[in-house]
Amino acid sequence: MPVFTTSFCALIFFVYILDNFLLIPKTETVTVKEKLWSGHNKGYINHALHLSEKKIKRGQIWRLVSSSLLHIGTWHIVSNITATLIVGCAVESQLGAAKTALCYIGATFISGLYMAFVYKLGEGEGASTGIYGLIAVFVMLAVKNGTFFFSPVPAIALIVLAVYTVGGMLLGKTTAFEHISGFAGGLLMGFILM
């Protein structure tokens, strides 16, 4: 049973429900469409956890990792949970829960540093930086084992993962840099932990 992967997916889904539907300041106007589909960043949790260079410089360093708990819109949360389940289960079957969690958190942290202080991203949220880190570790394990089918991941799941990976790079310059820095962080964590 992939303990980290399933627990993390449950956590980000729980945070998504709280932030998008329940914990919204009364002073904010959020439409039904924003709540159900396109998303918004007006919730209390988003304000407390999103990536922000200014707030990190004021000592709120948890934002380097906590932003990975946030998602804007239904497509964002569904695609990230799907990708996390596919790649996370595969990596966790080889490395175990603790090393998988360290790879995810390390990649998110490294990407957060890059996006906040090099790229100068104003605000950011999403689990994809850690997911791209796990994809990097997945590729490293595949090379080490000599095959992409080293885990219980079926071929169709690998196709979905490939679409997620390529599609995520096409969403714009900022998103591409987040994903590339997450992948680079995953490579670094993979070299350290494998």
Predicted regions and their residues:
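A detector for small-residue-rich transmembrane helices and their helix-helix packing motifs
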Residues: 1-194
